[in-house]
Amino acid sequence: MCWPPGMAWSRLGEPVWVDFNQGLDARLITPETASLLAGLHWIRFVRLSCDTSAMLPVIEQAAAYLREAGVAPSRLWAYVLVQDVPDAPRRVLALEKMGITPFAQPYRDYDGGEPPNEQKAFARWVNIRSVHNSCTWENYNDTRRRTRNGR
């Protein structure tokens, strides 16, 4: 049996379906690793993580490598850690401009406390696509956004 290079196969000769659900570190994606990743059967998305604005150029390069290797643009997806709300919209819009679907996650510290309402409202604006596509973050009017939960 001849398999494509980089394809993951089980011992029974069946393709292995993968899902790196915590987000791949874009800094580790080279043309070679992108080629290997493109050869995998993905359950859904190729997930990357964008915790800070400093990661945007790195993610842009990794996405280019993945596209060149044959990963469909519709499969590119990125977690956006929402800790600094004023910085988060810029990251979301930059990812969308790159053709990457963002998914906002409010920052939850180690004590397990609830994230601030502003972070949760931002995540709703990003993750509910109909809302996100209908208005900008600045024009998003969520009454829960206006109430502070003391954090």
Residues covered by each model-derived region:
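Auxiliary Fe-S-binding modules of radical SAM enzymes
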Residues: A69-V71, Y79-R151
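Core AdoMet radical
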Residues: M1-A62, P73-Q83, T101-P106
